[in-house]
Amino acid sequence: MRLPACQTVVLANQKGGCGKSTTAVNLAGGLARAGYSVCLVDLDPQCNTTTNFGVDPEELHEHGKPTILDAYLKSAPASAIEVGFEDRFDGLLTLLPGHRSLDQAEASLEAKLKSRSVEEGLSPLEEDDFRHESRMRLRKSLASLQKERDFILIDTPPRLGFELTTALLAANWYLIPVFASRYDTDGLTRLTQTVRKIRQRANQTLNLLGVVLGNFDPSTTLHKQIRETLQGKFGDDFCNTVIHRSIKHAEATFAKQTIFEHAPGHQTAAQFEELTTELIAHVERTLAPAAPPEPEVAPSPTHDGPPAQAVGEVSHG
């Protein structure tokens, strides 16, 4: 590992269709190309990230193979769920596949709690403890990868619900993908409020990695205005790299490939490479130990009397 510790990054935005899965897939590919060991986690019940790598969630279910749902319902370690791709990115990229029923995980856990409460007569405090433990199961599961991976990227569903909350509790960073749309930018206030509450209550180490603008058309005045608005609102947290609109995104998804595999010479691949480099630099700057303070230089002594006698100088009275 080239980082002091594994870094977990959540891609978060409750707005659907804002490029979360596309960004997650291609950022994972970019990190792997740069030589980092990466695990990509699919928490979206649509399973777009999972299918993008040619993994069929229905087939996994039919064959009884574990998915990320098992981290919640069975407390399975992520190391037992990982799917590897030895023939892609030198084996540096792995996947925790999603499950179509992931949006029912919270309800299933609540049903289990009610059953236990009836059978064992749990107190309200014990019920609260169970709910807290349920929200921390993803974090506990991912801990099994901490010594094996440089980065863990988590793709989340388009809502402020159980899955996103558990992801933010497990993360060091959150990255906000947005499209150049008023609807995308309007929803950021609620997301930042959610993050603030999680930081205050349970995860003080959670920090904003950046806001990345995608589907950008530089010839459109509105898109330029939205870019300026985001730059003004987020300042240095707004990513310098902007991902332009391109049919190559849809083509790569259809081919079940990252943009680096599908169109390595296209400007879109170059933009995701630039974004990867920018985000790595941000993480490295943050993790770098603070420089030691400069030693204080003692002031030169001042003398009110005659100059000091030089060594070896003979005094004449």
Segments predicted by a language model, with ranges:
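P-loop NTP-binding core
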Residues: M1-G317
